[in-house]
């Protein structure tokens, strides 16, 4: 009889918990009804990626072609093979849906609201053309374990779908490939300016979701992002600093109408790599010297594998095509050539300068920002991106001084932490052990940022993080790394 009572009581409690979860989801979705559409809300016993249900399967959104929505792939892109350690389970609410105001129907947003909340919110950008699940390994698992609520978005775009060479917006995967893809962000109504808009909109909606779930708004809000997501962080702190308390930019994309930018930096790599490969990867070849003088880090070769070769096959040309199709659409991508594209020449032949200026990073940040970048990044070379942005921040602060800004002690802090031998794709360390991971340093920088914002501690100075080292208050190498590569 006692077992019957216990079973009945257990069933009642389970039913009560299920009803409570449904009520919580219902109330939260009702609060977000004007901001989030087609939303799925679920109570999760574990919001970390230890739970297989946390990140949905690739191609799991109905009605979309393959590769348009690839969350499993997306979360692995920016994270090393050794993912963020997970030491606890975190129950809470997860919501995924569309941003209602988006006329294209592509803008998506993700919320993770842990039951054990620290009163703060993290807003995440997305790299490349990746989904709102891009930061699951690198950022979500890290900040959720500290009690942060987490919101992420997809820059207002889906990923891509397979197409043919006949598609005027098609981009081949690399110069040797016969596979063409169509990026959604090259469609009409998808200007790159939306990337900033949806980062800031995610912050606004995220704060509303937090207030609806916990009964109060977050007392602190931080922005984090990698690559194009790092660009989103920069632009967020430049355009809407009132929404944030600080940000971490992990190898963000630098955009300047005068240059450097991707349209100016990628063609020399595309043009010279085939001759370099034909030379047997000879570092003394003219082609290799051309890449180095353009600002690229030295190549690494292991057997038949080349670090430059990985970027040539996976990133350089397809990225140039994606940006050129959006920013300089009148250029004949493959008829005139990708490696021979000249940004300077195109300034007088098209509106590309104005289009790039509309999305440019200004350096005029309104809240503290830390950039973490690797010296061996061969997609966004450090001299052309991280260091260029640091110079832009310095120039913006200098301009404020010239205009008579007397409140200098309240200017937002900026730091550049360079990772010796760090690389854009952490997983490449599996092939080239000489490389160093960026993710641990980006996560450490996040902790340093929050400590500085919340407790007034000084951020460590700009520095080169030596191989095997960490960010320190008294760095052995302040400022820039002396060389882009340190062997063996």
Residue spans for each PLM region:
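Bacterial N-terminal signal peptides
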Residues: 4-15
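Sec/Tat signal peptide C-region and signal peptidase I cleavage site
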Residues: 17-21
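C-terminal His-loop and adjacent cap/lid subdomain of alpha/beta-hydrolase
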Residues: 22-488
